[in-house]
């Protein structure tokens, strides 16, 4: 018997071009409409730093007797400072996946899967991880994770104290720019946002003479600053515990200089770019598609 996937699309802010979060009310509604769901998978924080109400969503999901799995790939740092939102691992999620390499001092491709409750079938997880993982693990990567955890155990408090101090100082400075706006969670309208990861630096170009792609290019070509991503209406930078005071200073100076050069424009004249993807109609499940008769076109 094939099991189908049911997708819940996030709230959207069309003005800023940013996707928001998933509300507990929408989760409740979807689970009531789809009684055969066996697990609920949610991304929080998102790439842009949007955090959903994990605690309430966990309560909703558990009322339906299924586990909550949280993709917290961009939130491995949350546990280390009260400056950031609370990790899903502490809010009732049953399984939490974190990528060390995204926001902690660890090599690329290092990640962990936390089993946080008895609702997770440990033996089944081990079996499938054994199927999908390589039979030739990298001891360099595993040593990198050990070194990361050892470093955080010894110096983590001081490292994150300095990091959050420099980050907040930079955010305060960047918030004073007149045209390029540093986005806060409260600025994203109708978003279903419960909290916001302030290590994500979102620079809105709405109402300016540049778009996100051009701002990204200027930062790279003129200032040699490589941002994380460019979208139509904003640029994303991800700050992490390894960032230095000098690095924040360079970014602030660059944004301030660009802000002074560009022009303010009428928002109504901007192209109506939509964040939402087309709502596709599901004709078959992934498993059905894999097993279906196929035809090759040259």
Predicted regions located by residue number:
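Conserved PLP-enzyme active-site core in the AAT-like
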Residues: 3-187
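Non-catalytic terminal extensions of PLP-dependent enzymes
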Residues: 172-298
């Amino acid at each position: 018997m094939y099991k189908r996937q049911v997708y819940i699309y996030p709230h959207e802010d069309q003005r800023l071009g940013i996707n928001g979060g998933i509300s507990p009310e929408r989760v409740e509604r979807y689970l009531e409409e789809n009684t055969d769901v066996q697990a609920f998978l949610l991304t929080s924080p998102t790439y842009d730093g949007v955090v959903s109400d994990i605690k309430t969503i966990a309560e909703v999901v558990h009322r339906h007797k299924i586990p909550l799995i949280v993709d917290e790939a961009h939130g491995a740092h949350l546990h280390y400072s009260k400056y950031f939102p609370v990790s899903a691992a502490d809010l009732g999620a049953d399984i939490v996946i974190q990528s060390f390499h995204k926001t902690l001092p660890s090599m690329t491709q290092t990640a962990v899967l936390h089993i946080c409750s008895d609702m997770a079938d440990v033996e089944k997880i081990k079996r499938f991880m054994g199927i999908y993982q390589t039979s030739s693990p990298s001891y360099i990567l595993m040593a990198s994770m050990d070194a990361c955890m050892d470093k955080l155990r010894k110096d983590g408090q001081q490292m994150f104290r300095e990091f959050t101090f420099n980050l907040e100082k930079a955010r305060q400075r960047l918030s004073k720019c007149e045209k390029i706006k540093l986005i806060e969670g409260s600025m994203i309208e109708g978003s279903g946002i419960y909290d916001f990861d302030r290590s994500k630096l979102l620079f809105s170009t709405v109402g300016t003479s540049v778009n996100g792609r051009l701002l990204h290019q200027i930062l790279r070509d003129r200032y040699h600053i490589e941002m994380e991503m460019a979208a139509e209406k904003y640029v994303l930078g991800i700050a992490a515990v390894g960032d230095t005071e000098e690095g924040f200073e360079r970014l602030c100076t660059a944004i301030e200089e660009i802000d002074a050069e560009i022009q303010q424009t009428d928002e109504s004249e901007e192209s109506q770019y939509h964040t939402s993807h087309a709502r596709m109609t599901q004709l078959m499940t992934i498993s059905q598609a894999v097993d279906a008769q196929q035809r090759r076109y040259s």
